[in-house]
């Protein structure tokens, strides 16, 4: 059963009851997942940006967007409009497919993994996790990687509080670390 189907058939009714909500539309849901990678070396090394764009597209199944500098910062040797990273925003079926792969395949492949931190919520039910290496994703092969780079993964939910967001992600199978 896919994560989307499981959400509709089992997770949503359970959360409706557990959180004491009156309406099915009040139940928190995942709105989007954003993958972001900042590349400081992209200003001088265009190959790093190309490789990163390819990796992000492989991981997400969607073309990555080049992020550019908003301002010129002399100490970092960047000018306004220079490419400094890449990002992908996933919604709908691709989002659920990515979340399922991330929770069930990628997270267990992290070295010394004991669960994700329950403190990474932003106060509005959204969760951000930093990944140190892209090799945890089964789509990436070690031979094709030039440099090990990390990325930030943000899961944006419609939850009004961190508790609701944590309840949603826990039901989806996110392995939170025990305190």
From Swiss-Prot:
Annotated GO MF terms: rRNA binding; structural constituent of ribosome; tRNA binding
Alphabetically ordered keywords of this record: Ribonucleoprotein, Ribosomal protein, RNA-binding, rRNA-binding, tRNA-binding
Example GO biological process: translation
UniProt GO cellular component terms: ribonucleoprotein complex; ribosome
Protein task: This is one of the proteins that bind and probably mediate the attachment of the 5S RNA into the large ribosomal subunit, where it forms part of the central protuberance. In the 70S ribosome it contacts protein S13 of the 30S subunit (bridge B1b), connecting the 2 subunits; this bridge is implicated in subunit movement. Contacts the P site tRNA; the 5S rRNA and some of its associated proteins might help stabilize positioning of ribosome-bound tRNAs.
Similarity-based family: Belongs to the universal ribosomal protein uL5 family.
NCBIfam families listed in its UniProt record: PRK00010.1
Subunit note: Part of the 50S ribosomal subunit; part of the 5S rRNA/L5/L18/L25 subcomplex. Contacts the 5S rRNA and the P site tRNA. Forms a bridge to the 30S subunit in the 70S ribosome.
Name of the featured protein: Large ribosomal subunit protein uL5
């Amino acid at each position: 059963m896919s994560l989307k189907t499981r959400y509709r058939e089992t997770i949503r009714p359970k959360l409706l009851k557990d959180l004491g909500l009156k309406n099915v539309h009040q139940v928190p849901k995942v709105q989007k997942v954003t993958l972001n990678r900042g590349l400081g070396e992209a200003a001088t090394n265009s190959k790093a940006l190309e490789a990163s764009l390819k990796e992000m597209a492989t991981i997400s199944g969607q073309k990555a967007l080049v992020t550019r500098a908003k301002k010129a910062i002399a100490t970092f040797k960047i000018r306004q409009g220079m490419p400094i990273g890449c990002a992908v925003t996933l919604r709908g079926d691709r989002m659920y497919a990515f979340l399922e792969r991330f929770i069930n395949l990628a997270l267990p492949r992290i070295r010394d993994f004991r669960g994700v931190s329950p403190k990474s919520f932003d106060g509005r039910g959204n969760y951000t996790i930093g990944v140190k290496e892209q090799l945890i994703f089964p789509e990436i092969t070690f031979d094709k990687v030039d440099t090990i780079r990390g990325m930030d993964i943000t899961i944006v939910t419609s939850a009004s509080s961190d508790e609701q967001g944590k309840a949603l992600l826990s039901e989806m199978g996110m392995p939170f670390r025990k305190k």
